[in-house]
Amino acid sequence: MSQDLQKEVASRKTFAIISHPDAGKTTITEQLLLFGGVIRSAGTVKGKKSGKFATSDWMEIEKQRGISVTSSVMQFDYNGSRINILDTPGHSDFSEDTYRTLMAVDSAVMVIDAAKGIEAQTLKLFKVCRMRGIPIFTFINKMDRQGKMPLELLAELEEVLGIESYPMNWPIGMGKELAGIYDRYHRVIEQYRSEEDERFLPLGEDGDLKEVHAIQKSLYYDQALEEIMLLDEAGNDFSRERIIAGEQTPVFFGSALTNFGVETFLRTFVDFAPSPSSHESNEGVIEADNPKFSGFIFKIQANMNPAHRDRIAFIRICSGEFERGMNVTLTRTGKSMKLANSTQFMADDRETVNRAVAGDIIGLYDTGNYQIGDTITNGSKKLEFEKLPQFTPELFMRVYAKNVMKQKHFHKGVEQLVQEGAIQLFKTWRTEEYIIGAVGQLQFEVFEHRMRGEYNSEIRMEPIGKKIARWVKEEDADEKLSTARSMLVKDRFDQPLFLFENEFAINWFNDKNPDIELTSLL
């Protein structure tokens, strides 16, 4: 790999933003795009009344409900770095999509609501980041409102998540009393709601302001200085190595809604976030600077442009250089393909991409060739990157087309949304009626909404009273083993499994069939 290409790869910062719903994840994404010069004004995310919607919320249902249910990809340049942001679903029903997204990034930004602290979904996503060993940067949001005390939030981070924290800055007051943040890294105080020329006040060697300023009259100024002294003496030492290893999280305070502390966060993040790292494969570790092009598909999204009914497969480039028109092998099928139609996303615009390098995320127009988890490369034809996680669904519904004359629309919609990973598909063992599986109820709502809006197919869904899926070996697939509390079905790859009513039904099955092994996904 040439030095120029190595330099390009090193400039890539590819990260996901994770949070519990309503912590302000999409708002912070908007502000980052603002600093990247991609959008002129940040949309109000919950803008049902104003009619303004978040740049990263693609789908109609997202706009209506003010939540992200798909992961969007956005790219911009900032201070010599090429930033690739993946905005992930905050809602727990879409955790599978989020988990796959976390396989495609080199670091994560965890957004926490200062009033609520660590919430269930944050904890879940944090654990995946830890499992992958990727660095985690923490942004404690909504400091313009009353919330938990900063020291309490740090203690919660360390106790609940089991990770060292190092505050890069520290708030001076909060809510109505928020006066600014003390930036330990840049040695300045950033004022809240100040004139531009007064925004940053330099600190002296003693840690206090170089010149007397009105902010020192704030009720919370002296308290902030005392807390910083405490952190200097008794807090964790800053360690770049521990950050990269995912063992220490740099903590930033701010307010995404009022755009306070966000640019300071971005500037510091770019300094410390890792460049593209290596990926595990069946042929050993593939380094980002390997000259052969390789990548994997972590997401498929249909109908991003309803006018064109298009389907885009998102690929994380793991090594080498992508050039439009290049020939690659789809290793799952061994098929050779020409990558002629490719795109990149800049907020709500998309543009054809002619070249990209390791660390970049590009979209390939898909006519049905790709599946989530596919590897493409112009190197070894047997290369496969590690498998992407798949969850065992916990809710199941039979699904039918209301209008039998529109079966074609119905089948196309189900097939495409299943390929996208929006829902999981099962079929009854003999009659092959459709049963769909989801991790949470909202997935069914989105499925129904998209079938109607994107595929012109009205559907009927009926609960089947089964909640637990367990796979069996093909030789154990015997319909006689089905009971009122268990049902033999097959998945989309024709692998047999039983759907059980509850744990009691599983225990009963195990007692009766001790030689049959039941397995689950994640």
Curated annotation (Swiss-Prot):
Q: What's the name of the protein?
A: Peptide chain release factor 3
Question: What is the protein's known function?
Answer: Increases the formation of ribosomal termination complexes and stimulates activities of RF-1 and RF-2. It binds guanine nucleotides and has strong preference for UGA stop codons. It may interact directly with the ribosome. The stimulation of RF-1 and RF-2 is significantly reduced by GTP and GDP, but not by GMP.
| Residues in tr-type G domain copies | 10-277
Tell me a GO cellular component.
Answer: cytosol
The record's subcellular location field reads:
Cytoplasm
The keyword Protein biosynthesis is annotated on this UniProt entry: yes
Example GO BP: regulation of translational termination
UniProt family annotation: Belongs to the TRAFAC class translation factor GTPase superfamily. Classic translation factor GTPase family. PrfC subfamily.
Is the keyword Glycoprotein assigned to this protein?
Answer: no
Q: What is its main location?
A: cytoplasm
CDD domains, sorted? RF3 (cd04169), RF3_II (cd03689), RF3_III (cd16259)
Determine the domain of life of the protein's source: Bacteria
Q: Name one GO molecular function term.
A: GTP binding
What keywords is this UniProt entry annotated with? Cytoplasm, GTP-binding, Nucleotide-binding, Protein biosynthesis
What species is given as this protein's source?
A: Listeria innocua serovar 6a (strain ATCC BAA-680 / CLIP 11262)
Q: Where does GTP bind?
A: 19-26, 87-91, 141-144
Q: Which InterPro entries match?
A: EF-G-like_DII, EFG_III/V, G_TR_CS, P-loop_NTPase, PrfC, RF3_C, RF3_dom_3_sf, RF3_GTP-bd
Write down the HAMAP family for this protein, in alphabetical order.
Rel_fac_3 (MF_00072)
